[in-house]
């Protein structure tokens, strides 16, 4: 009988441990997981000016983003039930959004269901990813300016490294 009680105790302990682990994962899944969006060709990160809705997004080198600006380059990757993702900026709380073909990308109030805020990733042979709008399959790309980089959308071009991205650890504020 002692062996039966001992086995039952082990089983109950195992169930308790598994319950605690799975509960911890659920709690952790509700925490924001910030990342930065890094252009492989230029080595710059997409950031928000944090000036409100319908403002253009830009990119700069990590060493140029200091103090509170570091969090402007951090994005929470949120998953939609349809398999797409959307990006929420850590400081502004706004989402990356398509504005128009050959126009700069803007940030706007997040809805989670706005078609122009939904993205898919496409892994390419170099190991980089293309970040594609789900509603029209256009990709975001980085264009170099004189003092900073601009972020645009256009037809995807796998041969143009301006379209190559990586999701990297966030900048620490």
List where the protein language model places each region:
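Bacterial N-terminal signal peptides
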Residues: 12-21
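Lectin-like carbohydrate-binding module/patch detector with strong preference for beta-trefoil
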Residues: 29-173
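Bacterial N-terminal signal peptides that target proteins for export
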Residues: 2-13
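Sec/Tat signal peptide C-region and signal peptidase I cleavage site
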Residues: 24-28
């Amino acid at each position: 009988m002692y062996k039966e009680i001992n086995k039952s105790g082990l089983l109950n302990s195992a169930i308790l441990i598994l319950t605690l682990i799975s509960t911890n994962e659920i709690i952790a899944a509700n925490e924001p997981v910030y990342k930065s969006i890094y252009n492989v060709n230029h080595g710059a990160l997409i950031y928000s000016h944090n000036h409100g809705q319908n403002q253009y997004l830009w990119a700069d080198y990590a060493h140029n983003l200091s103090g509170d600006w570091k969090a402007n380059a951090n994005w929470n990757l949120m998953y939609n039930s349809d398999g797409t993702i959307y990006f929420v900026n850590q400081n502004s709380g706004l989402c990356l959004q398509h504005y128009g073909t050959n126009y700069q990308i803007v940030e706007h109030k997040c809805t989670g269901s706005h078609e122009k805020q939904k993205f898919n990733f496409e892994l390419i042979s170099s190991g980089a990813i293309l970040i594609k709008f789900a509603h029209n399959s256009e990709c975001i790309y980085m264009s170099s300016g004189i003092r900073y980089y601009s972020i645009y959308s256009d037809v995807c071009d796998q041969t143009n490294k301006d379209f190559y991205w990586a999701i990297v650890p966030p900048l620490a504020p």
